[in-house]
Amino acid sequence: MAGLATFVVSLLLVTLCAHCIDPAGSVSIPSSCCMFFISKKVPENRVVTYQLLNGSVCPKAGVVFTTKKNQKFCGDPQLHWVQKLMKNIEARRKKVSPGVRAMSTKALVQRYPANSTSI
């Protein structure tokens, strides 16, 4: 009976130790990394933004695109259509930015026309 109890306790200790020890060289991959790339071209008007993930954090470099419906998919940054889509999104972003600034300045000027005094 003592032999059986010793065996059970030993087995329990080995099982606990096996779960506590982290194997050497284990790598945790962030959930935001691209593991698979979409194979077909996505219409440009559906995509609103992108995030470039380099190979230093993730095993594969990839581009995470976000659609208007907040769906995310990965593109291979080596593909021509992915590079073109990134460039077009940047162009849209730069095109919108100056207009937004100009409109906000114009709105401030129109909002307070009584600030100037005339003699």
From Swiss-Prot:
Where in the sequence is the signal peptide annotated? 1-26
- GO:BP terms for this protein? antimicrobial humoral immune response mediated by antimicrobial peptide; chemokine-mediated signaling pathway; eosinophil chemotaxis; inflammatory response; positive regulation of cell migration
Q: Name one GO cellular component term.
A: extracellular space
Q: Which residues are glycosylated?
A: N54, N115
- What keyword terms does UniProt attach to this protein? Chemotaxis, Cytokine, Disulfide bond, Glycoprotein, Inflammatory response, Secreted, Signal
- Give the main localization category: secreted
Name where it's found. Answer: Secreted
RNA-binding among keywords: no
Record Pfam families? IL8 (PF00048)
**GO terms for MF:** CCR chemokine receptor binding; chemokine activity
What does the record give as the function of this protein? Chemotactic for resting T-lymphocytes, and eosinophils. Has lower chemotactic activity for neutrophils but none for monocytes and activated lymphocytes. Is a strong suppressor of colony formation by a multipotential hematopoietic progenitor cell line. Binds to CCR3.
Family statement = Belongs to the intercrine beta (chemokine CC) family.
Q: What is this protein called?
A: C-C motif chemokine 24
Q: What is the lineage of its organism?
A: Eukaryota, Metazoa, Chordata, Craniata, Vertebrata
User: Which gene name does the record give?
Assistant: CCL24
